[in-house]
């Protein structure tokens, strides 16, 4: 904007009437400029006091003067008339160009006006100073807000008072003002709402109102937001006089909620004083805070709230926000109750919950879900986001108006855990946004025993939220009404702008980290003050009694009423005989299981398809279904090759995946594929999103053009995050069993940055929380000389975490043995060697009557390997996933002549067959591929061993001996054959790194393992 600098510029010859007419015609509604009135010719240096953001106020006055010179103070009238006449705005500024003789006479006639200029300059400078003062409070007022309920610490680590905040009258000198200016009246700029209906206020009142808005029990951080509308919205919410008013009914409701929150913790302390419960004492206001957010969101149309939180206060939230039956909570404290045979279970302050009820404030139905989580702080954040995104997707809530998420955090974890940053950066990505999350930080100003000054480098624990321009509302938790107002504004912000917002509840922790911990060892001064601190319930009750809102008997009756509720629930809890984890399910799947939670059958239909369907999908996969769409020439060749494969009734890896996905879409199964570069594929094999070479950002997804009324296909390149994105996809898969949700690592090696999600959620999730999940992990794996970080998906780690017993041979004659195995396992681990088998295992994942995580070690070089092809015949009706692919060559025709039976999995099979052919040993060595590693195919492998009675057994792998599959396979193979024979090893030696970075060394190691595999005398010295 040109701002008022142009006032001192040389003017076009306009009459006053022409000036007003031009202004009224051209003045924009929001952004204003003088460009349509003046020629901007004066250099900026000539009028520095009129430049920058300080010009806003002068600009307002100037527009008012143009419309009616009498509407402004006489001093402003003098200033603008002098400026328009060409007089210099001050002795410090350069004069404009000389005036024409006619204009000079006009200046002469206005002599008294020019003489008044020095006073005008002072007035303008004072007004600009006041505007700067207002802005200083808006930017830095939170630094001096009274946020710590203990009054001994600063909520931010920077304890210095900003120089531009008026903490004493001598600070007025910073702005060129003094005490004599305090009673002067100043016009208020449009960037503040402290005036309410008044457009001007005395300086004393301006400072008082700014202190009330920004320096009391609420500190607002928002001026880093680069959106004027959003900043103005926040200013209005916190600056408008009298905006934080509550009715007596609202105050009574707040008191009742505080009673429930406080008395619940006290009840648990009385009954189980020696039990860990991670109570909420010191931040009891959290419960009414959450209920306020939910109430306001429900009022704005939200009917489903998904929550995630750590252990602190979790039982209280379950009881008083989610409304879990109190007796079910109390049962968790009974050490005599036996657990149902449903899994290993989890501690009570990790459990989740799902509940649908009526919101009493809005009288609307609302569903509340608290996601179960491990002790790993903040790990559940992306899981909650993913589940929220899924629920929005399934109900068509494209703007987040029906489903929302609330995340609770601790101050130390919010600042310290990197997953918080990863999750924030998903918040505005098109395929990951949940259209705004309300974050509530329980800031008890300590992390276990660690002082905040040792726990973070930023002033506040919430500073990470600034990266996504989320407003941050700090509030003193001992002021319940301030907390309620902030939470109401947070809910309104989310409803209005659909962006993240943070509420920082600055509180304290009355006990130690848990109820058994002694905090005085490390925080003696803090806890001396805490011992003196009056509980917030008592403070607020005394306030309301003094205000006449309630009387003492009413308050005591509220306490007695809730105490009675707790006692009655405690009595009912004694009737419970067994603990059921299923009572704590956070993501039920209505209709998928029987009423008692069992699969509706224990069979799986054929995963094959008719040739017509295969051909149709293949034709779409090899074409562009949109007209006037120009694809890359190289991609044209790829599609042409696909078309030729389809004509030859053959599929490669990319086509097999396409056919599996396309057929499930036809059956109404939503498919979501996510990960880094998955749209094209890291190895440029997938190409599920086509890009027009002539039109920027124009894309086509052929998979969404397969069938009329098909389910939608979502394929989305993720941010460069594994931990956050895998957690997100896990949460997405929680919402419905009728979706195939896949996460692909760029290379399998990189999954370990998401190890927490794998170790704490995917592997033990069902055992801990009775929560099935069908997520699929695609992990590119293979030793191909690409170095230690592009070779191994660490299969040994996944296999180590499988829950089957290597020393126990199951009942192989059991009906539906393979399905029962799948039902009993904690996850399925496969390494397919053919595209056809890959096709089948993807389809089986949905056709099974239950859900298990599926870990697939996918190939890299096999994607284009000429032998890694499957015929349509392997994918027709009646076919299915092959857990084991037996030898089908000459060795199988004469099994008595076979000297060695090699077991392997994955890509190494093609190295072995090539070497066997080169050595002409096709009749002496049989090769059996184990495609499904877990659950282990005992039954099929026993048949293979019995087929070759004279053969010695060896396991061959390309991975190092202490890695890969050997330590998992060997004991199970030995159990299969009742330890009748040894199982030898042919592979690389043990190593610390997964692979060498030297190509020659890689090839040498490969040849050595092949030599061992086909040297029939290799193991004689070990017999």
From Swiss-Prot:
- Matches recorded under Gene3D superfamilies: 3.40.50.12470, 3.40.50.970, Multifunctional 2-oxoglutarate metabolism enzyme, C-terminal domain, TPP helical domain
Q: Where is this cross-link: Glycyl lysine isopeptide (Lys-Gly) (interchain with G-Cter in ubiquitin)?
A: 534
| Record flagged with keyword Acetylation | yes
Keywords of this protein's UniProt record, alphabetized?
A: Acetylation, Calcium, Glycolysis, Isopeptide bond, Magnesium, Metal-binding, Mitochondrion, Nucleus, Oxidoreductase, Phosphoprotein, Thiamine pyrophosphate, Transit peptide, Ubl conjugation
Q: How is its activity regulated?
A: Calcium ions and ADP stimulate, whereas ATP and NADH reduce catalytic activity.
Tell me where it mainly resides: mitochondrion
A GO molecular-function annotation: oxoglutarate dehydrogenase (succinyl-transferring) activity
For the ligand (Mg(2+)), the binding residues are 411, 444, 446
UniProt record, GO biological process: 2-oxoglutarate metabolic process; glycolytic process; succinyl-CoA metabolic process; tricarboxylic acid cycle
Superkingdom of origin organism = Eukaryota
- CDD domains listed in its UniProt record: TPP_E1_OGDC_like
User: Recorded E.C. number(s)?
Assistant: 1.2.4.2
- Residues recorded as binding thiamine diphosphate, renumbered to this chain, are 312, 411, 444, 446, 676
Return the similarity comment: Belongs to the alpha-ketoglutarate dehydrogenase family.
Fill in the subunit field for this protein: Homodimer. The 2-oxoglutarate dehydrogenase complex is composed of OGDH (2-oxoglutarate dehydrogenase; E1), DLST (dihydrolipoamide succinyltransferase; E2), DLD (dihydrolipoamide dehydrogenase; E3) and the assembly factor KGD4. It contains multiple copies of the three enzymatic components (E1, E2 and E3). In the nucleus, the 2-oxoglutarate dehydrogenase complex associates with KAT2A. Interacts with ABHD11; this interaction maintains the functional lipoylation of the 2-oxoglutarate dehydrogenase complex.
**UniProt name for this protein:** 2-oxoglutarate dehydrogenase complex component E1
Q: Which species?
A: Bos taurus (Bovine)
């Amino acid at each position: 904007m040109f701002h008022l600098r142009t006032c001192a510029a040389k003017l076009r010859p306009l009459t006053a009437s022409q000036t007003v007419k031009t202004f009224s015609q051209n003045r924009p509604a929001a952004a204003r400029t003088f460009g349509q009135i003046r020629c901007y010719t004066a250099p900026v240096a000539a009028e520095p006091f009129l430049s920058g953001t300080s010009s806003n106020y002068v600009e307002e006055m100037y527009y008012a003067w143009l419309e009616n010179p009498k509407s402004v103070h006489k001093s402003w009238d003098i200033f603008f008339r002098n400026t328009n006449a060409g007089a210099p705005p001050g002795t410090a500024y350069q004069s404009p160009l000389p005036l024409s003789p006619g204009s000079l006479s006009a200046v002469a006639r206005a002599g008294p006006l020019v003489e008044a200029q020095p006073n005008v300059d002072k007035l303008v400078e004072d007004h600009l100073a006041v505007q700067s003062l207002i802005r200083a409070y808006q930017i830095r007022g939170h630094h001096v807000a009274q946020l710590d309920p203990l009054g001994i610490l600063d909520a931010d680590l920077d304890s210095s008072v900003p120089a531009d905040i008026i903490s004493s009258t001598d600070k007025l000198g910073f702005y060129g003002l003094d005490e004599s200016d305090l009673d002067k009246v100043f016009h208020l700029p449009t960037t503040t709402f402290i005036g309410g209906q008044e457009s001007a206020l005395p300086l004393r009142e301006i400072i008082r109102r700014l202190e009330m808005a920004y320096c009391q029990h609420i500190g607002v951080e928002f001026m880093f937001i680069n959106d004027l509308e959003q900043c103005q919205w926040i200013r209005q919410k916190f600056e408008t006089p009298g905006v934080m008013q509550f009715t007596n009914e609202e105050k009574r409701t707040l008191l009742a909620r505080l009673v429930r929150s406080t008395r619940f913790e006290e009840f648990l302390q009385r009954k189980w004083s020696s039990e860990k419960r991670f109570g909420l004492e010191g931040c009891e206001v959290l419960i009414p805070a959450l209920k306020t957010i939910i109430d306001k969101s429900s009022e704005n149309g939200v009917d489903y709230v998904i929550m995630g939180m750590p252990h602190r206060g979790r039982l209280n939230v379950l009881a008083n926000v989610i409304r879990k039956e109190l007796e079910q909570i109390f049962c968790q404290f009974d050490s005599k109750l036996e657990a149902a045979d449903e899994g290993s279970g989890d501690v009570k302050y990790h459990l989740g919950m799902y509940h649908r009820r009526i919101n009493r404030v809005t009288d609307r139905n609302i569903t509340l879900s608290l996601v179960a989580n491990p002790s790993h702080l903040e790990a559940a954040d992306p899981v909650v986001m993913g589940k929220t995104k899924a629920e929005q997707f399934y109900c068509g809530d494209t703007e987040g108006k029906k489903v929302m998420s609330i995340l609770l955090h601790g101050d130390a974890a919010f600042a310290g855990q990197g997953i918080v940053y990863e999750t924030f950066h998903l918040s505005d990505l098109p395929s990951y946004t949940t259209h705004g999350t309300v974050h509530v930080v329980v800031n008890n100003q300590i992390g276990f025993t660690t002082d905040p000054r040792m726990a973070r480098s930023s002033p506040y624990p919430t500073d990470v939220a600034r990266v996504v321009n989320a407003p941050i509302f700090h509030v003193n938790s001992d002021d319940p009404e301030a907390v309620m107002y902030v939470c109401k504004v947070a809910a309104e912000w989310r409803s209005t702008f659909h962006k993240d917002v943070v509420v920082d509840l600055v509180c304290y922790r009355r006990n130690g980290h848990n109820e058994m911990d002694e905090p005085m060892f490390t925080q003696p001064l803090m806890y001396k003050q805490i011992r003196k601190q009056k509980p917030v319930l008592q403070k607020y009750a005394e306030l309301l009694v003094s205000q006449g809102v309630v009387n003492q008997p009413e308050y005591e009756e509220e306490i007695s009423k809730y105490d009675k509720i707790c006692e009655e629930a405690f009595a009912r809890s004694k009737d419970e005989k067994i603990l059921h984890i299923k009572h704590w399910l956070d993501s039920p799947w209505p209709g998928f299981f029987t009423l008692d939670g069992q699969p509706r059958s224990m069979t799986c239909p054929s995963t094959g398809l008719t040739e017509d369907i295969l051909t149709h999908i293949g034709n779409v996969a090899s074409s562009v279904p949109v007209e006037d769409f120009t694809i890359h020439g190289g991609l044209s060749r790829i599609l042409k090759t696909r078309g030729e494969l389809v004509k030859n009734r053959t599929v490669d890896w990319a086509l097999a995946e396409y056919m599996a996905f396309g057929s499930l879409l036809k059956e109404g199964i939503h498919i979501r594929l996510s990960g880094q570069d998955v749209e094209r594929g890291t190895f440029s094999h997938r190409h599920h999103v086509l890009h027009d070479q002539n039109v920027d950002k124009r894309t086509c997804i052929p998979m969404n053009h397969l069938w009329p009324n098909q389910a939608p296909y979502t394929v989305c390149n993720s941010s460069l995050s594994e931990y956050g994105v895998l957690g997100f996809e896990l949460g997405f898969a929680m919402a419905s069993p009728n979706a195939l949700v896949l996460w692909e690592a760029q290379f399998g090696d990189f999954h370990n940055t998401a190890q927490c999600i794998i170790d704490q959620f995917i592997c033990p999730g069902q055992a801990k929380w009775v929560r099935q999940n069908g997520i699929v992990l695609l992990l590119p794996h293979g030793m191909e000389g690409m170095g230690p970080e592009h070779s191994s998906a660490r299969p040994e780690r996944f296999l180590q975490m499988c829950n089957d017993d290597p020393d126990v041979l199951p009942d192989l004659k059991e009906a539906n043995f393979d399905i029962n195995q799948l039902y009993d396992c904690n996850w399925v681990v496969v390494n397919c060697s053919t595209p056809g088998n890959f096709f089948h295992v993807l389809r089986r994942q949905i056709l099974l009557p239950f859900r298990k995580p599926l870990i697939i070690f996918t190939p890299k070089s096999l994607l284009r390997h000429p032998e890694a092809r499957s015929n349509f015949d392997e994918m027709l009706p009646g076919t299915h996933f092959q857990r084991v692919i037996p030898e089908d060559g000459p060795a199988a025709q004469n099994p008595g002549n076979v000297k060695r039976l090699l077991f392997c999995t994955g890509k190494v099979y093609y190295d072995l067959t090539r070497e066997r052919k080169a050595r002409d040993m096709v009749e002496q060595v049989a090769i059996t591929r184990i495609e499904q590693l877990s659950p282990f195919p005992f039954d099929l492998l026993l048949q293979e061993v019995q087929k070759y009675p004279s053969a010695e057994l060896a396991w061959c792998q390309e991975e190092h001996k202490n890695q890969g599959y050997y330590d998992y396979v060997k004991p199970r193979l030995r159990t299969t054959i009742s330890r009748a024979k040894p199982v030898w090893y042919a592979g690389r030696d043990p190593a610390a790194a997964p692979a060498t970075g030297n190509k020659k060394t890689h090839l040498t190691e490969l040849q050595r393992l092949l030599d061992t595999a086909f040297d029939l005398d290799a193991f004689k010295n070990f017999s």
